[in-house]
Amino acid sequence: MRSPRVIHLACVIAYIVAVEAGDKPVYLPRPTPPRPIHPRLAREVGWELEGQGLSPLSEAELLPEVRERRSPVDKGGYLPRPTPPRPVYRSRRDASLESELSPLSVAEVLPEVRERRSPVDKGGYLPRPTPPRPVYRSRRDASLESELSPLSEAEVLPEVRERRSPVDKGGYLPRPTPPRPVYRSRRVASLESELSPLSEAEVLPEVRERRSPVDKGGYLPRPTPPRPVYRSRRDASLESELSPLSEEEVLPEVRERGSPVDKGGYLPRPTPPRPVYRSRRDASLESELSPLSVAEDLPEVRERRSPVDKGGYLPRPTPPRPVYRSRRDASLESELSPLSEAEVLPEVRERRSPVDKGGYLPRPTPPRPVYRSRRDASLESELSPLSEAEVLPEVRERRSPVDKGGYLPRPTPPRPVYRSRRDASLESELSPLSEAEVLPEVRERRSPVDKGGYLPRPTPPRPVYRSRRDASLESELSPLSEAEVLPEVRERRSPVDKGGYLPRPTPPRPVYRSRRDATLESELSPSSEAEVLPEVRERRSPVDKGGYLPRPTPPRPVYRSRRDASLESELSPLSEAEVLPEVRERRSPVDKGGYLPRPTPPRPVYRSRRDASLESELSPLSEAEGLPEVRERRSPGGQGGYLPRPTPRTPLCRSRRDANLDAEQSPVSEGVVLPEVR
């Protein structure tokens, strides 16, 4: 570029030549101090022309364009304060274009370059000068170099252009940072080990598809200390599994089973070396597979590998943890003593619980003894007269899930096995029978609670209370022989009596007679017990058949219900034998069982309005004719339930219905009124 003074002199000379050519004297204006062209304008004009690939122009050609682009500041007034020269930095996009366009001619690419000029490169003031910033090679460039080594640039260049990330295409460079090394990712390391026996030409398409987005672009992170690549649990387990196989057979499976964690991403912060602990599943598999060949069992081993063993970082190192024998192992030893291992091993594999198949060992705790469960103790007493060979298959089927695996609980003081109420009741029932006849039934009736689980905390000895059902059965079964009633008694044993822990010891509780027992006594007085007993058994409610006794309370009297009082007044002229079946059918569920309420002051039986109205209706009728109607019209409220709280005595007022009935019945005979009442 020429200086502004030279340009000014050129303008004056051109003016003088033009005046001389016209042969006309023209006075020159008063000379003014020369004003230089601002350096910024000159730089912009020259820089734009050079960027478009044009040769530098002569001063004569450049002058008209310079005049048009003179800014108002340059046309008059004082010049702005000069600023230090600002260099034009090449953008990352320009650098990337140069590397891409090297094999192409500038003439072919120039139109594309003009269209792709960013607005930042086309004009405006340059930013404040900053220290030069180097262009770092991205991870994607490094990975592309390793991928494209066997290919020619001409084949790969179109693909490279399409895969250029927006970050690489333009914008200013970031602030300079300390040089950052490019670390090899775990995925690259794993790919190298996988692709060693294969040729790069075969694997390259697969490698391109498996490139993770993290490897494709972006700035490198801040440099950190080198991090070693730890062998994952999956690698260790694969080595032990693949030892008898060749790499060529296993490599496809290895590729499919590669976890996303092994395929890419940054390495974790360095930590102290962590040992690879053998999982419980590995230990159990070794003991199971000892009599089998590894080649036969390997497919099953691969299928049973848990997701925890397949990948992920190792946990922080912890003190070595011993593998405790589970309750299931102890129980299996006692069960399998008369059998050979070869017969039982398939069943053992199927019954391995998920807890025994993998996962980390728990924190070490003091040694815990294996307590014998109540089910084991009960089975011993049951199986004494039988041979183990006959009972062992049944024992295997009845093993509860609680006995099959899991960690042992914290050690607790030894807990005695208490006899359940069911055992006590069975003893009283089975006295006239031989054990050999009852033992199969006893096995079937063992409840799940008696079959396994931990023993409760030791408590003071608890007496076995006789339930209300036992007391009622004794009174019912007195005229019958035990041999006839025992089968029915077994069927009627409630689940509550069959097992479960005894409650905390409480003072002895008396067995109260229920309202149903009192009413049955009054009903059954003229009938023989032999006729009524089967029906009584069917009508025993579940509440009367078992359950714990309530806390002792002051003695509670048995109140007669309103229904009992009304039945007495109805049944007086009839024989109890005729009415008893109907009475049984009309017994409400409330009268059939349940605990007695808290004692309250005695409550009188009030006559309901319906009873009063029925009396007035039935006065002209014979009781024999009116009784069926009375029975049908008994309200549910009068048939049972607890009596209400006592209230001040209220007089019985005649209802409107009673008044209507009186008016209707007075002029009509009794025979005509009866159908109408019904």
From Swiss-Prot:
Region Disordered, annotated ranges: 58-97, 113-678
Sequence repeat intervals: 1-67, 68-114, 115-161, 162-208, 209-255, 256-302, 303-349, 350-396, 397-443, 444-490, 491-537, 538-584, 585-631, 632-678
Keyword Lipid biosynthesis tagged: no
The UniProt record lists the keyword Repeat: yes
UniProt GO BP: defense response to bacterium; innate immune response
Record-annotated membrane-spanning stretches: none
Localization (cell): Secreted
Keywords associated with the record: Antibiotic, Antimicrobial, Glycoprotein, Immunity, Innate immunity, Repeat, Secreted
Region of interest called 14 X approximate tandem repeats, as start-end residue ranges on this chain: 1-678
CC per GO annotation: extracellular region
Glycan-modified residues: 32, 83, 130, 177, 224, 271, 318, 365, 412, 459, 506, 553, 600, 647
Biased composition (Basic and acidic residues): 64-73, 158-167, 205-214, 299-308, 346-355, 393-402, 440-449, 487-496, 534-543, 581-590
Domain of life: Eukaryota
Comp. bias regions, Low complexity: 145-157, 188-204, 333-345, 380-392, 427-439, 474-486, 521-533, 568-580, 615-627
Function: Has antibacterial activity in vitro.
Identification of the protein by name: Probable antibacterial peptide polyprotein
